[in-house]
Amino acid sequence: VGELEWFDAYCKLDKGPGAANELMHLLRNAERDAASKGVVGVRDYEMAENIDTWISRFSQGLDGLRVEAGIYPERLRQAIDDGWHTGDELPGSHGLGHVGAMKMISDGSLNTRSAYCSMPYSGIRPETYGTLSYAPEQIESYMRLAVEHGFDIACHAIGDEANTIVLDCVERTHAHGSIEHAQMLKERDIPRLAQLGLAASIQPQHAMDDRDVITRFWGN
């Protein structure tokens, strides 16, 4: 089972019997727990109708955190048609909720050996470099559409070649936002993040998750 198939299955979980009520209960607990630890805001990149979902949640009193409701490329055109832009306040949120960035997943992950790399993974036959979720021209096209209609981008890129492709697309489209994870970078690409005004959105836990995987599987 590939990641895209898993994503499709994962998105069906929220539609199960009683899932909506259980989810609200879990979210309220999560908000309280986050606030107790000093967390004041989150970015929601669930594969769902996040804008409409958070308008509904704020109307139900789920207002313990600031929220940026992101969207995925497949929902970008609908968000544009509905008149949304990154930074727009969500109705009923009293300033706590805003439209977030367009989230893209450009490649896979290191643990599944699907992060897209410039050299093949060690010890795997047939030889593999990982996978891209979108062709480079698709990544550029979605970024261009986002820029033209006032959306920031948040692009997942883990493998070094995926990061190069994303940086190239940002350079051509003048997109603004972040690279999510930015986990492996070619040395020449590191300064490009600053030159292009991109944030490197890094999760320290991945350094622990993938330390041994990099040593074992990534190409020399």
Segments the model singles out, each with a brief description of its role:
Residues 59-66, 87-95, 146-149, 171-177, ...:
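Secondary-structure transition/capping motifs at alpha-helix termini
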Residues 130-172:
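Long hydrophobic segments that form regular secondary structure
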Residues 42, 48-51, 158-164, 184-187, ...:
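Active-site environment of divalent metal-dependent phosphoester hydrolases
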Residues 40-44, 152-157, 177-180:
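Short catalytic-loop micro-motif centered on adjacent basic/acidic residues
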Residues 110-113, 151-160, 202-204:
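Short acidic/histidine-rich active-site segments
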Residues 54-58, 79-85, 163-174:
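Distinct, well-ordered alpha-helical segments
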Residues 184-220:
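Active-site-adjacent C-terminal substructures of enzyme catalytic domains
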Residues 1-70, 93-147:
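Catalytic pocket of metal/acid-base enzymes, prominently hydrolases
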